[in-house]
Curated annotation (Swiss-Prot):
<comment type="subunit">
    <text>Homotetramer.</text>
</comment>
<feature type="binding site">
    <location>
        <position position="69"/>
    </location>
    <ligand>
        <name>NAD(+)</name>
    </ligand>
</feature>
<dbReference type="InterPro" id="IPR011304">
    <property type="entry name" value="L-lactate_DH"/>
</dbReference>
<keyword id="KW-0520">NAD</keyword>
<dbReference type="GO" id="GO:0004459">
    <property type="term" value="F:L-lactate dehydrogenase activity"/>
</dbReference>
<comment type="pathway">
    <text>Fermentation; pyruvate fermentation to lactate; (S)-lactate from pyruvate: step 1/1.</text>
</comment>
<feature type="binding site">
    <location>
        <position position="157"/>
    </location>
    <ligand>
        <name>beta-D-fructose 1,6-bisphosphate</name>
    </ligand>
</feature>
<dbReference type="InterPro" id="IPR036291">
    <property type="entry name" value="NAD(P)-bd_dom_sf"/>
</dbReference>
<keyword id="KW-0963">Cytoplasm</keyword>
<dbReference type="InterPro" id="IPR001557">
    <property type="entry name" value="L-lactate/malate_DH"/>
</dbReference>
<feature type="active site" description="Proton acceptor">
    <location>
        <position position="179"/>
    </location>
</feature>
<dbReference type="Pfam" id="PF02866">
    <property type="entry name" value="Ldh_1_C"/>
</dbReference>
<comment type="similarity">
    <text>Belongs to the LDH/MDH superfamily. LDH family.</text>
</comment>
<dbReference type="InterPro" id="IPR018177">
    <property type="entry name" value="L-lactate_DH_AS"/>
</dbReference>
<keyword id="KW-0597">Phosphoprotein</keyword>
<protein>
    <recommendedName>
        <fullName>L-lactate dehydrogenase</fullName>
        <ecNumber>1.1.1.27</ecNumber>
    </recommendedName>
</protein>
<feature type="binding site">
    <location>
        <begin position="122"/>
        <end position="124"/>
    </location>
    <ligand>
        <name>NAD(+)</name>
    </ligand>
</feature>
Amino acid sequence: MRNQKVNRTVLIGAGFVGSSYAFTLINQGITDELVIIDLNKDKAMGDVMDLNHGKAFAPHPVKTWYGTYDDCKEADIVCVCAGANQKPGETRLDLVEKNLKIFKGIIGEVMASGFDGIFLVATNPVDILTYATWKFSGLPKERVIGSGTTLDTARFRYLLSEYFGVAAHNAHGYIIGEHGDTELPVWSHANIGGVPVSDLLKRNEKYKAEDLDELFDNVKNAAYHIIEKKGATYYGVAMSLARITKAIYRNEEAILTVSAHLDGEFGENDVYIGVPAVVGRCGAREIVELDLNEKEKQQFKHSAGVLKAILKPHFELQA
């Protein structure tokens, strides 16, 4: 990573998610330089033109251009959004075979440039592909991050806020585990303005446990619902990627539920999975190990096991 004030972000993959991420970066003034790389040169160049035309309205001047892998050499963050798309009825894990092949080529090209920054992975299945990026790149684990369950956590907080009638930033809770079908809500730590959700259920009979079960189902299945209606999800994940990017560039040491590598935390080893982590200029420098209840521990173990079973045919895992 360059020891200078100019932050360069390279976006690989200018599809729905990548383009939305680029727009969010510029609209929020998060990066100084933005390089877009895509196999479809015309699409990427069109995005560059479109984004540059709105530069007069941006809060911060962002130099934006269509580039090549050579531009990764001076990059601080390379965000990978390239890969096969999730189709209706297809799980994120169904995409493994297709996207592992794509990623091996992409990561090889990036590393050949001399890149020494932070990888931010968005392509699904994100936990698997973040692990693959770590293996293919050879970078330290803290400098390879996936979007993980940051969006799931945001969805959770939004739906909690709607249910309890408060602002989203006053609804606190985490979704952890696989970004997918085995993710879990950490109800034992969920609270509204500091009041545990479990206490609110006891205090007011209008709040019901079955409502909260349905609420989580809506979190877990949100992507499927959106894909059914509009074909793809991209705004929410782009905003979560921008949030992670901002935390890195501003060295916020923000706690975000990214896909991070576990080395004994939560009783798991050698897996990338969505957990709260301290994110700053060095990447995901520390895992925040929550005190889970027994049910949550078992659910998390199951989620990690599902990911390891997918990884095992492709990588030699540590015990």
